[in-house]
Curated annotation (Swiss-Prot):
This enzyme's EC code(s): 2.7.1.50
UniProt-recorded Gene Ontology molecular function terms: ATP binding; hydroxyethylthiazole kinase activity; magnesium ion binding
Residues that hold substrate according to the record: M39, G187
UniProt entry keywords in alphabetical sequence: ATP-binding, Kinase, Magnesium, Metal-binding, Nucleotide-binding, Thiamine biosynthesis, Transferase
Biological processes annotated in GO: thiamine biosynthetic process; thiamine diphosphate biosynthetic process
Record field: catalytic activity: 5-(2-hydroxyethyl)-4-methylthiazole + ATP = 4-methyl-5-(2-phosphooxyethyl)-thiazole + ADP + H(+)
One Pfam assignment: HK
Name of the protein this chain belongs to: Hydroxyethylthiazole kinase
Coiled-coil stretches: none
Family: Belongs to the Thz kinase family.
Length: 263
């Protein structure tokens, strides 16, 4: 847990331009791992914030015509500042509007990580792909999708699901930790985007080890929280997840991590 230990010591400032539904949960999750979240949205202050921040999360869950230009502006300012961006294209396949905006953003600015479920990432590489919302039940080959997305966008790809896939450079990793309760809590996936950002430490081309650790810390914490005798369902799971992120130790991490490199 080299990266998590560093976070707990250095408290990296992590800027989150995220959706209205999840701001509180995302901020509390980042605080739980030791990061310092700032939910700054104004392009007018971005240049000053980005000089001292360690990463930027952009999550388009509540995209509107009113915030389109702000998102593009802060992404470009982050590029100018050398600040890595984690981009979460929430429900990109649910509407033509979202898909067009996401593609515009990816043409307008360079992001360091694209994080989404298989349907969302597929929508970024296949104009015919559709989905029902933030999740899809369709079986998809996440490794193949991640590799194709990496080839197109030349940026690290994190695909979440029952198993999580990370592709960076010539490496493809499958992770198999987590809990079904994550799908019953709104904003869990959005929090993961924030946690990934917290692990970047101004690395615009992040080491795959940082991404592996970020995803594994989150999912192992979810496993432990779900197994807690006080966890009765989604309502008790959420605070237990935060507590477990706060207390997670090296022994638990090493005992539970389930990782496989694939071709």
């Amino acid at each position: 847990m080299n990266y998590l230990n560093k976070i707990r010591i250095e408290n990296p400032l992590t800027i989150c331009y995220t959706n209205d539904v999840v701001k509180n949960f995302t901020a509390n999750g980042l605080l739980s791992i030791g990061a310092s979240p700032a939910m700054s949205e104004a392009p007018e202050e971005a240049e000053e914030f980005y000089k001292v921040a360690q990463a930027l999360l952009i999550n388009i869950g509540t995209l509107t015509a009113q915030n389109e230009q702000d998102i593009i502006a802060i992404a470009q300012t982050a590029n100018e500042a050398g600040l890595p961006i984690v981009f979460d294209p929430v429900a990109v396949g649910a509407s033509t509007y979202r898909k067009q905006f996401c593609k515009l953003l990816l043409k307008s600015a360079k992001v360091s990580v694209i994080k989404g479920n298989a349907s969302e990432i597929l929508a970024l590489i296949d104009d015919t792909a559709t989905m029902k919302g933030t999740d899809s039940d369709a079986y998809l080959d996440a490794v193949a999708i991640a590799k194709k997305a990496y080839a197109i966008y030349k940026t690290a790809i994190v695909i979440t699901g029952k198993e999580d896939v990370i592709v960076q450079g010539d490496k493809a990793i499958v992770l198999a930790n987590g809990s079904p309760l994550l799908a019953r809590v709104t904003g869990a996936g959005c929090l993961l985007g924030g946690i990934i950002a917290g692990f970047l430490f101004r690395e615009t081309e992040p080491d795959i080890e940082a991404l592996i650790e970020a995803v594994s810390v989150f999912n192992i914490a979810a496993e432990v929280a779900a197994e807690n005798e006080n966890c009765g369902g989604p309502g008790t799971f959420s605070p237990l997840l935060l507590d477990t992120l706060y207390h997670l130790n090296e022994t638990t991490y090493q005992q539970r991590i389930c990782i496989q490199e694939v071709e």
